[in-house]
């Protein structure tokens, strides 16, 4: 189950393009996308993603679900092997629903199921307010919330790390690729050279 595969970039589904072909003949990918009954922007994002399902052969077996705000049941309890989220945590933190999203993810997983997280990584010193403003979230905070709902951290990786990202950007993580929200166009090359954000990659388990 992939949470909000839009990734904030219309029509979304970058990671879905990896997951869907992999699971097409031996598994099922559930995409928990925006609620079509919410804002026009969210509804349009979902419609564009649904159109991709029709247009892209590897997407056609994807089952659609809803990740609404506040979060609702994603699918049947104790029914999926894995829940994945890519660069969404800062949005849920800003909306005030981060813990609830973790809880419905926990509920959806079978015992022994995996919760995988990729997120822009904040320095340990960042406050909640700094995380919300910058779009970066600290590993310690993610672990704290995950443990609170019942998850256990079992592994982390530096595969998505970027030591060039010092996290000190005027427009937060959105200053970097792929957004490049710049107040000074002369800084474009500087931020292209930095690349995308430094990211945590963590693996949790539902062990009971």
Region roles according to the model:
Residues 20-24, 98-111:
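A short glycine-rich, Lys/Arg-flanked "PGG" loop and its adjoining helix->strand segment in the class I
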Residues 28-32, 112-120:
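Conserved beta-strand signature within the Rossmann-like core of class I S-adenosyl-L-methionine
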Residues 42-72:
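S-adenosyl-L-methionine
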Residues 69, 91-104:
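A short, conserved alpha-helix within the catalytic core of class I
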Residues 72-83:
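A short acidic, Gly/Pro-enriched loop at the edge of an enzyme's catalytic core
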Residues 84-88:
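A conserved beta-strand element that flanks and buttresses the S-adenosyl-L-methionine
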Residues 135-156:
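Short alpha-helix
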Residues 166-208:
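Core SAM-dependent methyltransferase catalytic element
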């Amino acid at each position: 189950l992939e949470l909000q595969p839009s990734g904030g970039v219309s029509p979304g589904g970058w990671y879905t393009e990896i997951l869907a072909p992999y699971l097409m003949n031996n598994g099922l990918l559930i995409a928990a996308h925006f609620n079509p009954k919410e804002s026009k922007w969210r509804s349009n994002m979902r419609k564009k993603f649904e159109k991709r399902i029709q247009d892209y052969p590897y997407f056609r077996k994807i089952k659609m679900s809803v990740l609404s705000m506040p979060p609702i049941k994603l699918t049947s309890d104790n029914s999926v092997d894995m829940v994945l989220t890519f660069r969404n945590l800062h949005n849920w933190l800003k909306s005030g629903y981060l813990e609830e999203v973790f809880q419905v993810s926990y509920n959806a997983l079978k015992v022994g199921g995996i919760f995988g997280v990729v997120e822009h990584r904040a320095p340990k010193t960042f406050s909640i307010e700094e995380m919300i403003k910058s779009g970066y979230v600290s590993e310690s905070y993610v672990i704290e919330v995950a443990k609170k709902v019942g998850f256990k951290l079992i592994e982390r990786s530096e595969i998505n790390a970027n030591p060039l990202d010092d996290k000190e950007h005027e427009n937060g993580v959105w200053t970097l690729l792929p957004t490049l929200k710049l107040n000074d166009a002369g800084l474009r090359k500087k931020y292209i050279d930095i690349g995308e954000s430094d990211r945590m990659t963590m693996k949790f388990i539902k062990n009971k």
